[in-house]
Regions:
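N-terminal active-site segment of His-dependent metallophosphoesterases
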Residues: 1-55, 63-70, 128-131
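Residue-level signature for short turns and capping positions that connect secondary-structure elements
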Residues: 16-17, 88, 121, 150
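Short, solvent-exposed aromatic-acidic interface loops
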Residues: 144-152
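Conserved beta-sheet core of the metallophosphoesterase superfamily
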Residues: 77-145
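Active-site neighborhood of phospho(di)ester-bond hydrolases with catalytic His/Asp-centered motifs
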Residues: 11-13, 32-38, 56-61, 82-85, ...
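Short, conserved loop/helix-junction motifs that constitute active-site signature segments
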Residues: 48-52, 76, 110
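Helix-adjacent hinge/juxtasegments
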Residues: 54-92
Length: 152
Protein backbone atom coordinates (compact mmCIF):
# COMPACT_ATOMS: atom_id res chain seq x y z
CA UNK A 1 0.00 0.00 0.00
CA UNK A 2 1.40 3.40 -0.96
CA UNK A 3 2.32 5.66 1.90
CA UNK A 4 -0.11 8.47 2.56
CA UNK A 5 0.75 11.48 4.67
CA UNK A 6 -2.66 11.31 6.37
CA UNK A 7 -4.45 8.04 7.05
CA UNK A 8 -7.29 7.12 9.39
CA UNK A 9 -8.42 3.64 10.42
CA UNK A 10 -11.61 3.00 12.38
CA UNK A 11 -11.13 0.13 14.84
CA UNK A 12 -14.12 -1.72 16.27
CA UNK A 13 -14.60 -4.91 18.26
CA UNK A 14 -17.15 -6.98 20.13
CA UNK A 15 -20.25 -5.72 18.36
CA UNK A 16 -22.16 -8.92 19.23
CA UNK A 17 -24.85 -8.21 16.59
CA UNK A 18 -25.40 -4.63 17.73
CA UNK A 19 -23.78 -1.24 17.64
CA UNK A 20 -24.76 2.37 18.12
CA UNK A 21 -25.75 4.41 15.04
CA UNK A 22 -23.14 6.95 16.15
CA UNK A 23 -20.44 4.54 14.89
CA UNK A 24 -21.45 5.18 11.27
CA UNK A 25 -21.15 8.92 11.87
CA UNK A 26 -17.74 8.60 13.56
CA UNK A 27 -16.37 6.29 10.86
CA UNK A 28 -17.72 8.18 7.82
CA UNK A 29 -14.34 9.68 6.83
CA UNK A 30 -12.01 6.74 7.57
CA UNK A 31 -9.77 5.17 4.96
CA UNK A 32 -10.67 1.70 6.23
CA UNK A 33 -12.27 -0.19 9.13
CA UNK A 34 -10.76 -3.05 11.12
CA UNK A 35 -13.12 -5.31 13.14
CA UNK A 36 -11.32 -7.28 15.84
CA UNK A 37 -13.89 -10.05 16.27
CA UNK A 38 -17.08 -11.10 18.00
CA UNK A 39 -19.16 -9.80 15.11
CA UNK A 40 -21.52 -12.80 15.60
CA UNK A 41 -23.47 -12.44 12.32
CA UNK A 42 -22.69 -11.04 8.86
CA UNK A 43 -25.37 -8.24 8.75
CA UNK A 44 -23.23 -6.14 11.12
CA UNK A 45 -20.41 -6.31 8.58
CA UNK A 46 -22.79 -5.35 5.76
CA UNK A 47 -23.59 -2.17 7.69
CA UNK A 48 -19.88 -1.43 8.10
CA UNK A 49 -19.31 -2.09 4.38
CA UNK A 50 -21.93 0.59 3.68
CA UNK A 51 -19.49 3.05 5.31
CA UNK A 52 -16.42 1.81 3.40
CA UNK A 53 -15.67 -1.18 1.22
CA UNK A 54 -12.24 -1.41 2.88
CA UNK A 55 -13.23 -3.65 5.78
CA UNK A 56 -10.84 -6.11 7.43
CA UNK A 57 -12.16 -8.68 9.92
CA UNK A 58 -10.64 -11.27 12.25
CA UNK A 59 -12.65 -13.97 14.01
CA UNK A 60 -13.67 -13.73 17.64
CA UNK A 61 -14.52 -16.54 20.04
CA UNK A 62 -18.27 -16.04 19.32
CA UNK A 63 -18.03 -15.96 15.51
CA UNK A 64 -19.18 -19.54 14.92
CA UNK A 65 -20.92 -18.88 11.58
CA UNK A 66 -18.26 -16.64 10.00
CA UNK A 67 -15.24 -17.57 7.89
CA UNK A 68 -12.57 -14.94 8.49
CA UNK A 69 -8.99 -15.55 9.63
CA UNK A 70 -8.28 -15.75 13.38
CA UNK A 71 -5.46 -13.20 13.01
CA UNK A 72 -3.89 -10.98 10.37
CA UNK A 73 -0.60 -9.18 9.88
CA UNK A 74 -0.91 -5.92 7.95
CA UNK A 75 1.36 -3.04 7.05
CA UNK A 76 0.21 0.53 6.66
CA UNK A 77 2.47 3.50 5.98
CA UNK A 78 5.56 1.56 7.06
CA UNK A 79 4.12 0.33 10.37
CA UNK A 80 3.28 -3.31 11.14
CA UNK A 81 -0.06 -4.28 12.70
CA UNK A 82 -1.12 -7.64 14.14
CA UNK A 83 -4.91 -8.01 14.43
CA UNK A 84 -6.38 -10.68 16.70
CA UNK A 85 -9.38 -11.07 19.00
CA UNK A 86 -7.76 -12.53 22.12
CA UNK A 87 -4.41 -11.18 23.27
CA UNK A 88 -1.80 -13.89 22.55
CA UNK A 89 0.55 -15.26 25.20
CA UNK A 90 3.58 -14.50 23.01
CA UNK A 91 4.09 -11.15 21.38
CA UNK A 92 4.41 -11.46 17.59
CA UNK A 93 7.03 -9.34 15.79
CA UNK A 94 5.00 -6.19 15.15
CA UNK A 95 4.77 -2.49 15.95
CA UNK A 96 1.10 -2.65 16.96
CA UNK A 97 -0.96 -5.47 18.47
CA UNK A 98 -4.68 -4.78 18.16
CA UNK A 99 -7.09 -6.97 20.12
CA UNK A 100 -10.63 -7.11 21.49
CA UNK A 101 -12.34 -9.70 23.72
CA UNK A 102 -12.10 -7.88 27.08
CA UNK A 103 -14.74 -5.27 26.16
CA UNK A 104 -12.50 -2.71 27.87
CA UNK A 105 -10.39 -0.10 26.06
CA UNK A 106 -6.61 -0.34 26.38
CA UNK A 107 -3.81 1.80 24.98
CA UNK A 108 -0.34 0.97 26.30
CA UNK A 109 3.21 -0.01 25.39
CA UNK A 110 4.63 -3.43 26.25
CA UNK A 111 8.16 -4.43 25.26
CA UNK A 112 8.25 -1.94 22.40
CA UNK A 113 4.86 -3.03 21.04
CA UNK A 114 1.86 -0.71 21.12
CA UNK A 115 -1.13 -2.66 22.53
CA UNK A 116 -4.51 -1.25 21.53
CA UNK A 117 -8.03 -2.44 22.31
CA UNK A 118 -10.92 -0.21 21.15
CA UNK A 119 -13.26 -1.73 23.75
CA UNK A 120 -16.70 -3.02 22.86
CA UNK A 121 -19.02 -1.24 20.44
CA UNK A 122 -22.00 -3.46 21.15
CA UNK A 123 -22.02 -5.16 24.54
CA UNK A 124 -20.92 -3.38 27.71
CA UNK A 125 -18.98 -5.40 30.27
CA UNK A 126 -18.52 -4.75 33.99
CA UNK A 127 -19.20 -1.04 33.79
CA UNK A 128 -16.93 -0.30 30.83
CA UNK A 129 -18.60 2.15 28.44
CA UNK A 130 -19.24 1.27 24.80
CA UNK A 131 -16.42 2.56 22.61
CA UNK A 132 -14.56 2.42 19.31
CA UNK A 133 -11.03 3.37 18.36
CA UNK A 134 -9.06 5.23 15.74
CA UNK A 135 -5.54 4.91 14.45
CA UNK A 136 -4.58 8.20 12.86
CA UNK A 137 -1.49 9.26 10.93
CA UNK A 138 -1.09 12.99 10.32
CA UNK A 139 1.52 14.79 8.25
CA UNK A 140 3.57 11.63 7.69
CA UNK A 141 4.14 11.00 11.40
CA UNK A 142 3.65 7.66 13.15
CA UNK A 143 0.14 6.39 13.86
CA UNK A 144 -1.52 7.46 17.10
CA UNK A 145 -4.35 5.62 18.84
CA UNK A 146 -7.48 7.12 20.35
CA UNK A 147 -10.56 5.63 22.02
CA UNK A 148 -13.94 7.34 21.57
CA UNK A 149 -16.71 6.62 24.09
CA UNK A 150 -20.09 6.03 22.45
CA UNK A 151 -22.07 6.88 25.57
CA UNK A 152 -21.37 8.47 28.91
Amino acid sequence: MAEKQNYRIGVISDTHDRWKPRVAELFRDVDEIWHLGDVCHEPVLDELRAITSKLTVVLGNNDFELTYPPSLDLERCGERFHLVHILPRRMPPTDWLLFGHTHRPADEMHGGVHLFNPGSAGLANKGAPLSVGFLTRENGKKFRAKVILLER
